[in-house]
Amino acid sequence: MMSDDIVLPLQFTDAAANKVKILVSDEENPNLRLRVYITGGGCSGFQYGFTFDDQINEGDMTIEKQGVELVVDPMSLQYLVGGCVDYTEGLEGSRFIVTNPNAKTTCGCGSSFSI
């Protein structure tokens, strides 16, 4: 018997999905998806980026949760395997965050890392 549980290379939390749902509703464009990507830069060599995108490009991976989608390009995904996209609210403010087991060091800002 096969399991219905599919292990995804990147997790997308309920908190993040709920926030995306609210933001997409505010924009009044149901085709928007949260795209997470990695660029060179930041104090540790790489940094995470988040944007809303209404396009899915060839090779992109999508994760659907609660009626919204997270999109990751293949180049970024290789650095994010095993990670988790979450949304947090605290004294420092509210933001999407990535927990990345591949990051050897991270910066105090939380958005920069090295591998």
Curated annotation (Swiss-Prot):
Keyword Cell inner membrane attributed: no
Gene name as annotated: erpA
Provenance organism: Photorhabdus laumondii subsp. laumondii (strain DSM 15139 / CIP 105565 / TT01) (Photorhabdus luminescens subsp. laumondii)
Function comment: Required for insertion of 4Fe-4S clusters for at least IspG.
Cofactor comment text: Binds 1 iron-sulfur cluster per subunit.
GO cellular component: cytosol
Cofactor(s) annotated in UniProt: iron-sulfur cluster
Coiled-coil parts of chain: none
Chain positions recorded as iron-sulfur cluster binding sites: C43, C107, C109
UniProt keyword terms in alphabetical order: Iron, Iron-sulfur, Metal-binding
Protein's name according to its UniProt entry: Iron-sulfur cluster insertion protein ErpA
Quaternary organization: Homodimer.
GO biological process, one term: iron-sulfur cluster assembly
Taxonomic classification: Bacteria, Pseudomonadati, Pseudomonadota, Gammaproteobacteria, Enterobacterales
